[in-house]
Amino acid sequence: MYAVIKTGGKQYRVAAGEKIKVEQIAADVGQEVVIDQVLAVGNGAEIKVGTPLVSGASVKATVVAHGKHDKVHIFKMRRRKHYQKRQGHRQQFTELQIVAIAA
């Protein structure tokens, strides 16, 4: 069984037992999180697609860790004007362990 969930402005295809990295969630490590924004649920050849959400469906997950992705380097330059700007960014994430999918 799998589900397509929406969290942090992105969509993820998840199944029970998987680990995924999502945008940072305000939850402690070890805490259980319920994601109720389920866009689709599939079980073999049977697929249930919501308009836009599947009513009554939810995904339970446990917070495994918090961290930061690799650094992204930004470099801006204006040719012939002696202007250079360097900047870096590390996006924070939360790693989730999918426990169960309820449809």
Curated annotation (Swiss-Prot):
Recorded family membership: Belongs to the bacterial ribosomal protein bL21 family.
Assembly: Part of the 50S ribosomal subunit. Contacts protein L20.
Pfam families: Ribosomal_L21p (PF00829)
PANTHER family: 50S RIBOSOMAL PROTEIN L21, LARGE RIBOSOMAL SUBUNIT PROTEIN BL21M
Protein name listed in UniProt: Large ribosomal subunit protein bL21
Key words, A-Z: Ribonucleoprotein, Ribosomal protein, RNA-binding, rRNA-binding
Purpose of the protein: This protein binds to 23S rRNA in the presence of protein L20.
GN (gene name): rplU
Keyword presence, Cell membrane: no
NCBIfam families listed in its UniProt record: L21
InterPro entries tied to this protein: bL21-like, bL21-like_sf, Ribosomal_bL21, Ribosomal_bL21_CS
GO process terms (BP): translation
